């Protein structure tokens, strides 16, 4: 049973609206259709796929600040455009290059501290 592709990341949050806005404005994801679950939340889409699922919880998960998820990653295009967007928004980020390749990487955090890693295969 080989893996085929990345499907989605599921994040628990007490701030669904703020997190939705971040993923919409910074990464360009679109809020879209979501099944009628018995709990509140939002699904954010990259094209036809809901890649970020937000699940509303009463209080912020893991109040100690210790993250259980190290990072999640997307492939992307438009390195310069996104770097400028992060700079203008005042979002701290780190640029790196994947050793032995032309892949540039951007790493930054969403409003709740989850690390987002973007690979730009076109350098």
Language model regions located:
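A short, compositionally biased micro-patch
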Residues: 37, 47, 77-79, 99-101, ...
């Amino acid at each position: 049973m080989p893996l085929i592709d990345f499907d989605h990341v599921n994040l628990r949050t007490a701030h669904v609206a703020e997190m939705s806005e971040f993923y919409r404005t910074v990464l360009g994801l679109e809020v879209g259709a979501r099944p009628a679950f018995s709990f509140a939340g939002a699904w954010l889409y990259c094209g036809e796929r809901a890649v970020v699922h937000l699940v509303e919880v009463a209080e912020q998960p893991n109040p100690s600040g210790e993250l259980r998820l190290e990072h999640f990653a997307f492939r992307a295009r438009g390195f310069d455009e996104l770097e400028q967007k992060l700079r203008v928004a005042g979002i701290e980020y780190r640029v790196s290059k994947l050793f032995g390749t032309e892949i540039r990487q951007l790493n930054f955090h969403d409003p709740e501290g989850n690390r987002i890693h973007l690979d730009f295969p076109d350098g």
